[in-house]
């Protein structure tokens, strides 16, 4: 059973079933850049349109093309393999002499734009991502589907971490527990994990820490959805500013806060677990602690704290920007919308219903980053 298969739906029962990614063209993602190139400097920014390949493969190909070490190629985020995606890469060329860019173009990738910049591309340096998703074999009443889409556009959705974060059948969370010295029995109890001499690479360890953190966040968000407060206010709420990681509060409920919440200027937040005190207090903190009071959650919390991670926050609510839809055929529905960095298109699909994803296990860990 996966970490996301039993998540509650905020807008009610599923209104459709469908299939996605029978071809890469059914899942298109375009990065929304956070800045314009300076036109000078020793970092060549390449906007690459790729098909059927993951980000790491393209980065390695660019390094080989430029004759530099792979660490000289940077990107803002990982993108799906089983998709058609557009994203920026930076290639460090101190002499400002680039090989023939046209030599990069093939059936897997095309360079659609290039420019020089005065610094390398940093992870997370993007405004967001624009998605165009095509759902096929759609089953469900058209009126109900369209009403659900309108509700999503108006009210937003829970800001779940998507299934890509957790690996096949949620295996990354079990692996994180094992890394912390535990194994979960079928009845939910914890047992000591067998001693392993295998050392994890840094990237593997980071992936498991992220999976553990994400699972705990989803459990808190699940509790808020179940009580109907995922897009509202509890006493002791820690608020997150829309479009940023800035957090403020808790503070007394006021008309001003209510207005900001209604216009999506602020969102309630949940914990990205680590060492330190929860930012929330009172009722909000009680919900968070209660949702994470079972033995596996406690073990994950303790493991994250011991690993040196610090308490952070993530918005509980997400609003897709510019949500549009059109019926290409009676059973083919195309969706288009933009999401902030670190948010998952699969969270939008979950509020619609059950979508079978042919590319489900051919994606990067941060497929929607």
Swiss-Prot record:
Question: What is one GO biological process annotated to this record?
Answer: tRNA pseudouridine synthesis
Known EC number(s)? 5.4.99.27
Reaction catalysed by this enzyme: uridine(13) in tRNA = pseudouridine(13) in tRNA
An example of a Gene Ontology cellular component annotation for this protein is:
cytosol
Catalytic positions?
A: 80 (nucleophile)
Q: Which GO terms describe its molecular function?
A: RNA binding; tRNA pseudouridine(13) synthase activity
In the UniProt record, the signal sequence range is none
Record domain TRUD: where? 156-318
- Which keywords accompany this UniProt record? Isomerase, tRNA processing
The reply on keyword tRNA processing is: yes
One Pfam family hit:
TruD
Catalytic class of the enzyme? isomerase
The family annotation for this protein states:
Belongs to the pseudouridine synthase TruD family.
| Protein function | Responsible for synthesis of pseudouridine from uracil-13 in transfer RNAs.
The molecule here is called: tRNA pseudouridine synthase D
Q: Which organism is it from?
A: Xanthomonas axonopodis pv. citri (strain 306)
Gene name of the encoded protein: truD
């Amino acid at each position: 059973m996966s970490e996301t298969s039993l998540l509650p739906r905020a807008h009610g029962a599923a209104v459709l079933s469908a299939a996605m990614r029978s071809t890469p063209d059914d899942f298109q993602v375009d990065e929304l850049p956070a800045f314009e190139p300076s036109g000078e400097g020793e970092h060549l920014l390449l906007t690459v349109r790729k098909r059927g390949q993951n980000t790491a493969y393209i980065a390695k190909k660019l390094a080989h093309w430029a004759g530099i070490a792979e660490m000289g190629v940077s990107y803002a985020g990982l993108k799906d393999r089983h998709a058609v995606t557009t994203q920026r890469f930076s290639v460090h060329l101190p002499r400002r002499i680039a090989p023939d860019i046209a030599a990069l173009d093939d059936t897997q990738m095309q360079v659609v734009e290039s420019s020089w910049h005065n610094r390398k591309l940093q992870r997370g340096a993007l405004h967001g991502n624009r998605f165009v998703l095509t759902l096929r074999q759609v089953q469900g009443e058209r009126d109900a589907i369209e009403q659900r889409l309108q509700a999503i556009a108006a009210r937003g959705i829970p800001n779940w971490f998507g299934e890509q974060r957790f690996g096949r059948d949620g295996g990354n969370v079990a692996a994180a527990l094992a890394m912390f010295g535990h194994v979960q029995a079928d009845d939910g109890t914890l047992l000591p994990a067998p001693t392993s001499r295998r050392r994890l690479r840094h990237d593997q360890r980071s992936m498991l820490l992220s999976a553990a953190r994400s699972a705990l966040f989803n459990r808190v968000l699940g509790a808020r959805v179940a009580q109907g407060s995922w897009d509202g206010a509890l006493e002791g709420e820690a608020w997150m500013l829309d479009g940023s990681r800035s957090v403020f509060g808790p503070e007394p409920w006021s008309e001003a806060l209510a207005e900001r919440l209604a216009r999506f200027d602020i969102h309630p937040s949940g914990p990205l677990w680590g060492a330190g005190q929860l930012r929330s207090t009172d009722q909000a903190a009680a919900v968070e602690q209660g949702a994470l009071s079972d033995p596996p959650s406690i073990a994950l919390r303790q493991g994250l704290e011991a690993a040196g991670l610090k308490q952070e926050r993530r918005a509980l609510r997400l609003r897709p920007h510019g949500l549009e839809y059109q019926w290409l055929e009676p059973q083919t529905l195309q969706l288009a919308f933009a999401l902030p960095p670190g948010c998952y298109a699969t969270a939008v699909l979950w509020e619609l219903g059950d979508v079978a994803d042919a590319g489900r296990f051919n994606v990067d860990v941060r497929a929607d980053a």
